């Protein structure tokens, strides 16, 4: 069985994808819900997913075409942190809001001018969190090269 079919079956069997009436973070109503934050509870499948993303990036984007991964908490960050470790690339993450304590930053990680960044997100409905993250990064004089979403 190829990875996509095997992974979809796993998501269904472990109730990571559920069917019913759901209201998503964007406010959109959906007949299904995917909670990829549960995948690290299944380390073998989690590693397969990370490896599959690594292969996709190698073949379709090329590791030489970006400097760092960027993501948003929480779902995307879970994936991006493991992926960054596997491909040995830095990781930046963007909070929805700046912290009210410590350094009061919304963007964490080292960003240099003109870095090419690859956005990793777990599930996208309206794209709002990705758009807001890109705006925060652009304020730091950087752009996002490409966005990858698992769903």
Could you describe each region identified by the protein language model?
Residues 1-151:
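PRPP-associated nucleotide enzymes
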């Amino acid at each position: 069985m190829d990875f996509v079919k095997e992974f979809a079956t796993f998501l269904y069997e472990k109730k990571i994808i559920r069917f019913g009436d759901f209201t998503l973070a964007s406010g959109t109503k959906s007949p299904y819900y995917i909670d990829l934050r549960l995948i690290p509870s299944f380390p073998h499948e989690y590693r397969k997913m990370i490896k599959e993303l690594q292969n996709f990036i190698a073949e379709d984007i090329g590791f030489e075409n970006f400097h760092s991964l960027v993501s948003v908490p929480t779902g995307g960050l879970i994936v991006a942190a493991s992926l960054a470790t596997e491909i040995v690339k830095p990781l930046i993450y963007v909070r929805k809001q700046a912290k009210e304590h410590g350094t009061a930053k919304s963007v964490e990680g080292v960003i240099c001018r003109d870095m090419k960044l690859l956005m990793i997100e777990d599930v996208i409905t309206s794209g709002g969190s990705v758009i807001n993250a890109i705006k925060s990064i652009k304020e730091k004089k950087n752009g996002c090269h490409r966005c990858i979403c698992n769903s």
